[in-house]
Each structure stands twice: as C-alpha cells, then as structure tokens.
C-alpha cells in the first residue's frame, strides 16, 4: 500500500487530524505535523495500539459481512390483464472464523451452566447475566438455526446486525481497497460504542424491572426453570449441525412467516411458538426485543442448498355452482363477436350456434336483431331488445324538457328553385342588391346559398339552390327546411326537367308554391305557355281557378319584384310562422366545408331558439363547441335567432348537408350520440356489403369482370361532394363503373395522392387545389390530378373516360358475293369452284360464309383465289375467278359471301 500523510489518513478514517496525531503519540510514533508521511508499518503499529487499548489483541477481523441486492421483474395475471411487478431480493452473508466460533460455543455453554447454579426463584435475576455473555452474538449471526431462547442471549444478539453494517455503511469503497487497517479501526470503535449502548439499555431495563414486585414462582415454575438450562445446552450443542429451514419458513397452514418475526417465535417448532417462548422468558418486554431481533445468517462453511420457497397454488376462483344467466341487450344490428362478449362466451360458440341454425357467419359479421335473439335464447340467456335510436330519443327528450320559452313570430324561409339558367340567382341578386350570379363559376349556382334580406314587407331568409340535375339532393334539402318555395320558370324556355323535379320536392315537403315567370323582358317570352305546361303538372294559376300565385318578373329590369315579395309575404302570413325564443337552438345544416386556417366551417339555418357562441352543438355525426359565428356579410355575431343563417366554427368534422342540429347541455352526451351514429352507419354499411357479397358470389362466374375507374374526389363544400358522387355513380353500366375510393372536403393533400397511388385512381378536384407536397408527389409517381370549376365538365370527362374503357362493338360488313357456276377437282387444292363475282369484290384474306338457298351452312376462309392461272388477292364485280374453300366442298348454285369485321367505339 502506498504511503500517505497523516491528514489523508484522518480523512480516509473520518476522524479529526488532532485526534489521530494524539493517538499516534500515545502509540509511540514521532509524527507531529499533518503533512508527515505514515508508512504501512506505522499504520499497523497504530492499529495494534488501538486494539490493545480497547481490549482486543486479534489483528484480523472475526467476521466479514457481505451484502447483495438484485432487482428483477415478475409478470402476474389479474382480472384486468397482465401486470409487471418489481421484485427486490436482498442477500446478506456473514463469514466467521471457525476456531473462534467453537471457542464462543464453549464459552456460551459455560455461561449457561453457571446460570443454572445461580437461578433460583426470582424471575428478574436472569436479566442481569447478559452483560457478561458478550460473545454469543457472533455465534447467532451466521447460523439461522434456533439456538438459545433464554433472555440472556437475546439482547446479546442485537449488536450482531449493527456491527457488520457499521463497517459497510461508514466506509467507502475506495477506503476498503486502499486501507484495510482504517476499516479495522472504525469497526473496533463502532463495536465498542454499540456494546456500551447495549449494556446501558440492559441496565436500564433491569432497573425498571427491579422496581416492580416479582410474583413468587410456584412449584411448576421452579421445575420449568430447573429444566431450562439443560435445554440451552442441548440447543448450543446443535449449532454446528446443518438444519432445514422449512419449519422456520412455513407454518402448518402453508403461510409464510413474517421475515421480521423474532427468533423466540421461529426457533420453537409447532403451533405454540409464542407460548414456548414465554416458557423461557418471563419478561414480555424483552420478548418483544427477541421477536424483533435481526434474522441470523447461515455460516458460509455450513451453507446448504438454497431453500425452496413454497407458494400456495390454491387460486381464488371458485367454480360457480349454477349456470349464470345474463340479460343481453340486443340492438337492431350487432356483430357476432360483440354478442359473444355480452353473453360472456367464446365467439366460436356463437358461430357454432348460428351454423346449427343454418346461418354461416364470421366473428366480425353483423347479424340482425331477430337472429341474435334466437342465439341468445338458444344459449340459455335472456334477450333484451333495445331500439337503435334509444340513446338519441333519450337526448331529445332531455333537450325537449328545457323548451319552455315563449314563442315569437319569425321570418319566413324562402327557397328559390327551378331549372338551370332560368335566372334564380339573378332574381335573388336583384332582391339582395348584390352581384352574386356573375361570380358563380360558369354562371351557375353550385352551392346552397343562405341570405337574409330586409325588404319593405319585412325580413326574409332566402335559400338559393342549384338547378343542375346533379343537385337533386340539395333541392330536396332546400324544400325540407323551407316555408315557401319560389319556382322560377323562364318565359322563353318553359317547363324543364328540373322544374318538374322542384314541383315534386315542394309537394313532398308540403310547402306552398309561388311561381315567378322570369325573363319577361325578352321578346320571345310566352307566359301562357308556362301556365299551360304547369297546369299539366297540376299547378293551377289563381286566375285560372287554382291556388298558386303566378307573378311575371324580370331579374334585369326589376319588373314584378315587389309583387313577388308581396306574394311571398302574404303566403307566409297565412302560415302564421312562430318559433320559441330563449331556449336551446335547433335547426338544419345547409352546407359545410373544410377551410384551411379555420377548420370546419358549417352554414346552418336556425329554426328555433337562440344559437350562442360557446354552445355545444350536435349535428349528425359531428359535434363541437361553437367558437365563432358570422352572418352572410362576414360580420361576427354572438347570437343567432330563429330563421337566421350563420356560419359557425368549432365542429370536429364537416357534417352532412341536411343534417339537423341541436344544442345539447353536455359535451359528453354529444360525443356519445355522435359516436353512436357513426357506429350505426358503419354497421349498416357492413351489412349492405355482406348482403352484396352473398348475392353476387356466383354471379361473376363465367363472365368478364366489370371494369372500374377509381377516383379520389375532393370538393370545396359537402353539398357539392354529395352531388358529384351521386352523378358519377349513376354514369356506369354493367361493364364499366366509377369507384370513388376516397372523397372529402378541402384541398388535395399528400394523403390523397398516396391513396390514389395505392388504388390506381385519378384525383379530381372541384374548386380546390393541391398543395406543394401533393403536387410534387403526384409528379414523381405520375399520378394525374385534374381540376374543375364547372360540374358539367367534370361529369363529361369522367363519362368519356368510362366510354374509352368499354369494349368496342364488332360490326360485320359484306364486301362481296360470288356465285358458284361450276366445280372441278385440282390435284393440288382438291375441289375448286368456278365462280362469278356478282356483287362487290372478293378478297383473299377475309372470312367467308357459304350460303345454300340463302341459308348459312358454313363459315370459314378461302384457301386460294385465282384469276385464270394467276394467284390474286382481290377479284372485282363481274369477273370470273376460281375459289378454293378450305375444308369444305361447295356445290353448283351456292353463294360465297365475303365479309369484314370492323370495331366501332362505344359510348355511354
């Protein structure tokens, strides 16, 4: 070991420098300064002096205690799943010199024999003896076998545990390696201190016990005490024998003892552990000391096999005595797996039951309510049928319970309907005094516009619907949420298909009609023609004895506009429109879109109550808190009353146009209903797909597969998306069809291009554009992106693309006919017919038919065609030729018909 200075030695030992210097001077060393160097021999001399001064002469340590701690993980199963538990195992081993252990055992036996002579009737007397027997602690520490139960040795064992930890806790790892002598010094001083504290505690306990009167022992007690020292000696004699820890670790019930239990309990076998301990020790307070004494360690020399920990394998589950019957709630549709889960059985059991009933089903396949009820009853449970709309009905009842506000008159909601280009938007434009029609793409309206207009006849709310055929659903929605319909018909064009459709929608919704005959400023205007055509549709003018008002107007000159507004106001007055105020709002979603920067924007029409910022709104499968509201002029508003169209922000997804909305008190309920609606739609979709699969399972065998044009469609608003989807799905036929693999509202993103890449689709954007990343990806992967702003162009291009996918039509054309005049045989070609071309021309390489009495009897090809002795490829009308028909013999009078097959492109 390297030489160190006095200050370094004091630092490593943890003692003051002055104290080390004084101890060195007492030991006869000449060190005076902290910087003096201490050699190994001087350290040994100092250590020997310190040990001799404390009554120790042995230089080596009597025992060494090693500690080890390991941490592992254990996975345990529980009712809710598997759980990982951290397990920490702490091991402590004490190594003691064998010769010292033997000496201490003999010394302990001698002490025990001396006690036998001293023990008389006082119970307190044995407490005084532990002060002399200081060494048995070393014996008890290494050997876990129950040794001595007497009170004399229990306090003696207490320093055994602190003695070793003092070494390991107060010395650092570096000092253990660098200087073993310092360790011994520290250990000696700590041992002396612990011994002094122990003796003081025992003296204190003895004095307290001496103050109490001791009961006189009976004859039985005296006999017990006479027998006790012999028991001690026998236990001490067993110290050297290895033992089994099974009796220590587990009691008769199989339960493990507490590790902190004392030796007074552990060392006595049998159920009466504490009672046996009381036989040895009459002092209950000192018994507590024995019980809490540290667990003794086994000697390394006598170390046996690692004890096997017994764990009770008895589980907590008890098999039910009777079958459990569940009340199974069954909605209108439920999957097989979910039904099995509600009955607490395996899904295979439900599938097996369905197979017995003649139904083939998979785990994820939905089944109807009746089938599920039969399965539940078959398996012995009780079926409880619930309505699919139960949760919605409950929510509506809760909302309806709060509708107690007073009703006030409201403005009429007027929908402008009619055929495309008949002037609907221009008429509304004149009323609003704003230029809207000129801003529409292609001059046609492609969205439902909601406007509130202040007129001389009061406030009116107008809905402007598209007139194109693709926007049938929009017109239907407009009629459903309106009070009065203005049917615009061009005076120079008359009644058109969309005009008839608008009449049908108005009748289906039970909404009164006001007919506006537009374009009266044109010279070709013919209002009587319009009246006649509408009369054929059972729309009779008032001046003809009907109940429908016909107003002649012009959107350009303003002719008849005031009369039209007056007619609408009169019709609304007859309806006596009113709505509740100061109640949760309800209404209908007119339009929705995804706006970059603002999120989901929905145009809603409030039909009752007051819609306020911060309300929780539920619309179809969408819900959210209203973050902001704007009117038709783009101004921020805080409240929207009845008949008010507003744009709202804050929904999670764009709702479907036409969905009814209502304000609910709790966001949790709104989320629950929205998720329920989405799940119901998913189940219905799965059911439709499954039905289609079963019906068409064998339909395609032996037939050509249908060609599919895959499309990813993105639009600016939800209404346009629905209209274009409906129009595209109507284009196809049995051979070709459109498959819309993805659709949505908002700009074209990289996800849309990736979807088109994986499905082999083209990307169509209607009034939207692709972002930079999507354009770059599309260019790299050669994905076609097409933009449109007019619905005609989009539908026409998709239709032409589908037409190009159709198989061409094969058309036969007769190019020539030759009559057989004579037949003769040729050694080279066999039978040859001498013919006269009577019509068209005969070609060598075209297919032929042989006709006999104008009936086709053979179809094949020519083997040879000659004019005199020359092979020719064509013989014209009125010319003789020789024809050899391959694999057929012709007769005189037959006709040989030459035809050609041409492919003609088809169109949808």
UniProtKB/Swiss-Prot annotation:
Record-level GO cellular component terms: cytosol
Location of region: G5: 554-556
SUPFAM superfamilies per the UniProt record, alphabetical: Initiation factor IF2/eIF5b, domain 3, P-loop containing nucleoside triphosphate hydrolases, Putative DNA-binding domain, Translation proteins
Region feature (G2): 443-447
Residue stretches of biased makeup (Low complexity): 157-166
Keywords carried by this UniProt record: Cytoplasm, GTP-binding, Initiation factor, Nucleotide-binding, Protein biosynthesis
InterPro entries to which the protein is assigned, alphabetical: DNA-bd_dom_put_sf, EF-G-like_DII, IF2_assoc_dom_bac, IF2_II, IF2_N, P-loop_NTPase, Small_GTP-bd, T_Tr_GTP-bd_dom
Keyword Calcium: no
Biased composition (Basic and acidic residues): 223-248
Domain (tr-type G): residue spans on this chain: 409-578
Region listing for G3, in residue ranges: 464-467
Binding site for GTP: 418-425, 464-468, 518-521
Residue ranges with Acidic residues bias: 132-143
Function: One of the essential components for the initiation of protein synthesis. Protects formylmethionyl-tRNA from spontaneous hydrolysis and promotes its binding to the 30S ribosomal subunits. Also involved in the hydrolysis of GTP during the formation of the 70S ribosomal complex.
NCBIfam families cross-referenced by the UniProt entry: IF-2, small_GTP
Protein name as it appears in the record: Translation initiation factor IF-2
Organism: Saccharophagus degradans (strain 2-40 / ATCC 43961 / DSM 17024)
Taxonomic lineage from the root: Bacteria, Pseudomonadati, Pseudomonadota, Gammaproteobacteria, Cellvibrionales
């Amino acid at each position: 070991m390297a030489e160190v200075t006095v200050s370094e030695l004091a630092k490593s030992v943890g003692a003051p420098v002055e104290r080390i210097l004084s101890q060195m001077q007492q030991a006869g060393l000449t060190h005076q300064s902290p910087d003096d160097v201490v050699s190994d021999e001087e350290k040994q001399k100092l250590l020997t002096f310190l040990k001799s001064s404390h009554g120790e002469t042995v230089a080596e340590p009597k025992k060494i205690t090693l500690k080890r701690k390991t941490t592992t993980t254990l996975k345990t199963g529980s009712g809710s799943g598997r759980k990982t538990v951290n397990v920490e195992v702490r091991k402590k081993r004490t190594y003691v010199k064998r010769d010292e252990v033997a000496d201490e055992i003999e010394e302990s036996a001698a002490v025990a024999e001396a006690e036998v002579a001293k023990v008389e009737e006082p119970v307190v007397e044995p407490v005084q003896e532990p002060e002399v027997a200081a060494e048995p602690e070393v014996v008890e520490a290494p050997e876990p076998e129950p040794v001595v139960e007497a009170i004399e040795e229990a306090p003696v064992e207490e320093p055994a545990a602190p003695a070793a930890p003092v070494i390991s806790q107060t010395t650092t790892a570096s000092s253990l390696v660098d200087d073993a002598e310092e360790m011994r010094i520290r250990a000696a001083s700590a041992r002396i201190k612990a011994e002094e504290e122990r003796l003081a505690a025992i003296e204190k306990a003895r004095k307290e016990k001496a103050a109490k009167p001791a009961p006189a022992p009976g004859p039985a007690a005296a006999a017990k005490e006479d027998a006790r020292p012999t028991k001690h000696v026998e236990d001490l004699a067993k110290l050297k024998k290895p033992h089994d820890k099974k009796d220590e670790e587990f009691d008769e019930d199989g339960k493990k003892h507490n590790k902190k239990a004392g030796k007074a309990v552990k060392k006595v076998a049998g159920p009466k552990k504490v009672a046996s301990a009381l036989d040895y020790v009459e002092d209950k307070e000192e018994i507590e000391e024995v019980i809490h004494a540290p667990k003794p360690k086994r000697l390394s020399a006598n170390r046996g096999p690692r004890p096997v920990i017994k764990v009770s394998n008895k589980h907590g589950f008890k098999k039910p005595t009777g079958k459990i019957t569940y009340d199974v709630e069954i909605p209108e549709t439920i999957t097989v797996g979910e039904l099995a889960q509600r009955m607490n059985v395996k899904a295979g059991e439900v599938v097996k039951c369905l197979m017995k009933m003649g139904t083939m089903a998979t785990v994820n396949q939905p089944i109807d309510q009746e089938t599920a009820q039969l399965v539940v009853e078959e398996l012995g449970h009780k079926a409880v049928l619930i309505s699919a709309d139960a949760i919605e009905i409950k929510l509506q009842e809760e909302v309806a319970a709060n509708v107690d506000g007073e009703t006030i008159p409201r403005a009429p909601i007027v929908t402008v309907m009619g055929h495309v280009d008949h002037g609907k938007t221009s008429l509304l434009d004149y009323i609003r005094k704003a230029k809207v029609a000129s801003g529409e793409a292609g001059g046609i309206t492609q969205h439902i516009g909601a406007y509130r207009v202040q007129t001389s006849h009061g406030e009116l709310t107008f809905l402007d619907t598209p007139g194109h055929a693709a926007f049938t659903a929009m017109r239907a929605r407009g009629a459903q949420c309106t009070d009065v319909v203005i049917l615009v018909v061009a005076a120079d064009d008359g009644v058109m298909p969309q005009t008839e459709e608008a009449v049908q929608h108005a009748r289906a919704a039970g909404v009164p009609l006001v007919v506006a005959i537009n374009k009266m400023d044109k010279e070709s205007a013919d209002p009587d023609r319009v009246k006649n055509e509408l009369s054929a549709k059972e729309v009779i003018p008032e001046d003809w004895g009907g109940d429908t008002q016909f107003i002649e107007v012009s959107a350009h000159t303003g002719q008849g506009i005031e009369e039209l507004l007056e007619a609408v106001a009169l019709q609304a007055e007859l309806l006596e429109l009113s709505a509740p105020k100061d109640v949760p709002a309800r209404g209908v979603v007119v339009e929705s879109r995804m706006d970059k920067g603002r999120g989901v924007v929905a145009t809603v029409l409030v039909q009752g109550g007051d819609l306020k910022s911060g309300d929780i709104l539920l619309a179809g499968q969408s819900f959210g808190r209203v973050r902001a509201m704007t009117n038709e002029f783009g101004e921020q508003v805080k409240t929207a009353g009845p008949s008010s169209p507003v744009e709202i922000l804050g929904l999670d997804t764009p709702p479907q146009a036409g969905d009814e909305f209502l304000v609910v008190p709790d966001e949790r309920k709104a989320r629950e209903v929205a998720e329920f609606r989405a799940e119901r739609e998913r189940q219905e979709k799965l059911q439709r797909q499954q039905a289609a699969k079963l019906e068409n399972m064998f339909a395609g065998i032996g037939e050509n597969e249908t060609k599919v044009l895959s499309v990813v469609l993105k639009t600016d608003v939800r209404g346009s998306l629905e209209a274009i989807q409906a129009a595209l799905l109507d284009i196809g036929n049995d051979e070709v069809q459109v498959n819309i693999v993805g659709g949505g509202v908002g700009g074209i993103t990289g996800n849309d291009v990736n979807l088109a890449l994986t499905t082999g689709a083209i990307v169509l954007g209607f009034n939207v554009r692709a972002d930079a990343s999507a354009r770059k990806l599309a260019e790299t992967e050669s994905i076609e992106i097409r933009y449109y702003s007019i619905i005609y162009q989009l539908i026409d291009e998709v239709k032409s693309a589908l037409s190009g996918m159709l198989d061409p039509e094969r058309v036969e054309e007769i190019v020539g006919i030759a009559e057989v005049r004579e037949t003769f045989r040729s050694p080279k070609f066999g039978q040859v017919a001498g013919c006269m071309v009577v019509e068209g021309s005969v070609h060598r390489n075209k297919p032929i038919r042989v006709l006999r009495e104008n009936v086709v009897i053979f179809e094949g090809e020519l083997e040879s065609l000659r004019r005199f002795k020359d092979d020719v490829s064509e013989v014209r009308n009125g010319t003789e030729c020789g024809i050899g028909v391959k694999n057929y013999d012709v007769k005189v009078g037959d006709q040989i018909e030459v035809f050609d097959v041409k492919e003609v492109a088809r169109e949808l």
